[in-house]
Amino acid sequence: MPISEEHVGRSYPATAPYEVSRAKIAEFARALSDPDNPAYAGLDPVAPPTFAVVLASAAWDAMFADPELELSLSRTVHADQRFAWHRPLRAGDAVQAQLKIEKVRARGATAIITISVLLSTTDGEELCTATSTLMHTNVEAA
């Protein structure tokens, strides 16, 4: 059965810890064409806000691997993204990501799926909630 409102509330185990490093922060800042931003350099850099996507998208793997949902990344469009921050990601943080399905709406052959991914340290400190809206075309319409 494809993803439906019945799946709202389903959550998946947290990802393996990801250690945020100065090198990865610098690499991401270069990809944003912002390598000279002092916030992203030095001895205690913070990660650019959108770096959270690196961690949040890793949590998507469990949802897309769930055979009951019949999801395929090749039939999915990332329509919206929001972040609610408690504090910035810093070099040295060991971060886990846990995904929860918040809302599912059907519009014809398309499922509009809202997911939240809670990023927290391995010590349980909540860092950020990344909320995404995905549009997925079901198999029968593909």
Language-model features: locations:
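Hot-dog-fold acyl-thioester-processing enzymes
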Residues: 1-80, 141
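HotDog/MaoC-like acyl-thioester-processing domains
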Residues: 1-3, 85-142
